[in-house]
């Protein structure tokens, strides 16, 4: 294979500690990196780097399968999933597996199958990872040029990008096919309190789908996180899958334009920084999605959202006091505003009290009581169904609160049930991971840009203090 440039220009930020750049070996002498620098030792060893990535995929899939089976083993069908600390079974239930009307679990066998399939897959990936890490060729360029690459080869890099985009597009279409043809998905908005249904009438209008992207991210608008019907979600996946697949084909067939060649840094560490930035954005969006959205993340499985629990409490006490004879339309609260109901600045009737800040909540148990101008007083007096009372009382006592101060008026009880909502776990973990990924992006982007500009910051290893100290042993 012909190398078009000197190895010195190829990746010199990684070799600041030594003069050698032999490709063999994975030790500090030959790579400039000690064992703890992980995959940095494999920058020029495409075969070994493949092994590291396949083994990592195996670990991920093994966790998914093992945790899945752990949750199945501990699952009690009589209790809601969100009371049992589950984070994987709610995802499977949302996809329509094993659940019936109202989100009731009627069959746990699909969950068991999912866990076993992931365990078997992880064994295959684990074997492949060990094979390529220990036995396979160190570099792929000579024997398998299709799988080989040189980090500076812009055309090859965009081809790899294209392949990744096609795989992402196929993944998006898997959800579409599940919703359309393979049993459907769970719809929390189905009449009577949620059910599994096939999505037949997809939203494919570009003005609707891309309208979400143009919305404000703030209250009442909520950007893409505000999506509240499955037709839009599945239709969005059709658009996303199509864009990814066609974009992937385009990147495979084309070479980067001159402006892209000039604007981007073309090195392994630069690609790492781009990937970390993308994952960071995904983490922050997922954090907001699981915290606020009760359509993609149905409250039957994940527990209520914070606003939902707060509004549920206001609703529960409105129901109670109305039965006791209170006139909920005119009762005044301690601040002079309505105790149970009030008007928003734009005139809609909303719940009063601290929960007024969550006036824009939409939830399947509440929407039937709304009219053209917000909550409908006559419906609140005549149309409240027992299932709505039960649902709101349940959600009121399962708020996703990990907060010391601002709890939206929800009554907190120090002797309450030991409960942490999956929404709290999932949103917090994705925020923290998204933040770490962002810091990693800044770090690696800075290093990659410094290397491309031809200067490096680092310790002068010839005069490092540790070199003059006595060895530990």
UniProtKB/Swiss-Prot annotation:
Record GO terms (molecular function): chlorophyll binding; electron transporter, transferring electrons within the cyclic electron transport pathway of photosynthesis activity; metal ion binding; mRNA binding
InterPro entries: PS_antenna-like, PS_II_antenna-like_sf, PSII_PsbC, PSII_PsbC_sf
Gene: psbC
Membrane topology: Multi-pass membrane protein
Transmembrane regions: 69-93, 134-155, 178-200, 255-275, 291-312, 447-471
Keywords: Acetylation, Chlorophyll, Chloroplast, Chromophore, Manganese, Membrane, Metal-binding, Phosphoprotein, Photosynthesis, Photosystem II, Plastid, Thylakoid, Transmembrane, Transmembrane helix
GO biological process, one term: photosynthetic electron transport in photosystem II
Homology family: Belongs to the PsbB/PsbC family. PsbC subfamily.
Main localization of the protein described in the UniProt heading: plastid
Record-given protein name: Photosystem II CP43 reaction center protein
Residues with the N-acetylthreonine modification: 15
Organism: Arabidopsis thaliana (Mouse-ear cress)
